[in-house]
Amino acid sequence: MEKRRKSILNKPSKKQSISYNEGHGFKKEVEIQLIKYLGRLSPEIEMPARAKGINGSNSYDVDIHITIKGKGLFANRGDIWVECKWKDNSPVRESDIQKLVIKAQDAFRHVTELGGFYYDTLIMVSNQDFDINALSYANALDVLCLRFYQGQLIEKNAPMNWVGDPAWMKQENYLKAFRS
């Protein structure tokens, strides 16, 4: 019995953690595909970036910051926060989307009180699929979910207003979606 317990305890884990180089490589691949995906919008990529929270001491890593500069007289400018989520074997969960939304809301509150630019679009990109709760939560708060699969980005949901004025910016809509 003692030998069996030792062998179980010393057994190497099948779960492999991703190294910095692999994670950075994933982000670079996502960046290349996002340029293609958003090509007609003339994206400018900044990698990595930071977002300040409400008290200024909270500062969040932004995996990829994309600035959209529309063309023409009435062109809008937009700033996109892209979160790259590498998962070993599990799908992206609702809690993963919640963490991104909470960080973005904190950064948005910082900007509304102190001024500056803000991220008006959230995109979550993962190498794994998204579970159904994550997708419904993302749809309710207008977060676009993309899966990076075989070198391509695949849309996993269809939020109504993921560019410009998404629901996650409006506190009452956030609370309704969070409680449901």
Give each language-model segment a name.
Residues 1-180:
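Mixed-charge (Asp/Glu-Lys/Arg
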